[in-house]
Amino acid sequence: MTETTNERSATLIDLAEIRGAASLPVVSFDRHELGAILRVYGRMVAAGEWRDYAIDTLRDRAVFSIFRRFSEMPLYRVEKTPKLARKQGAYSVVAAGGLVMKRGQDLAQVLRVFDKSLKLVDD
């Protein structure tokens, strides 16, 4: 008695080989950068001004978006764009309308745009 079997075999494909040079590394925030951003974020959440955030890692930049409510457009975006590091600075804070509020080489300096300024109060 001879049995015939229909075997189907799967072919494994290494996606890294297929993508090859087309898969460029993505830009992301390192641990220290993310820590600095989250310190400012935590302070503003405690003050009741911000409620949510999102992190996007793209090929040319990393974006930390800040929301009052998640269903809205972001109030601010903290962006890291390495290709601008030698020109205008890798870090920037962008307002909802697209206005660049602060740009620079040092993330801590750029994040100071969120510090509340002291105001003189008349008696």
PLM regions with names:
Residues T2-E3, T11, S117:
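Long, non-catalytic architectural segments outside compact domain cores
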Residues P74-P82, V100-L107:
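Short amphipathic beta-strand/extended segments with alternating polar/hydrophobic composition
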Residues I13, V78-G98:
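Short aromatic-glycine-(Arg/Gly/Cys) micro-motifs in beta-strand/loop hairpins
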Residues Y53-V63, F67-E72, A85-R86, A96-G97, ...:
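Basic nucleic-acid-binding interfaces
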Residues S92-V121:
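Mixed-charge, glycine-accented linear interaction segment located at domain edges/termini
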Residues A47, E72-M73:
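Amphipathic alpha-helical interaction surfaces
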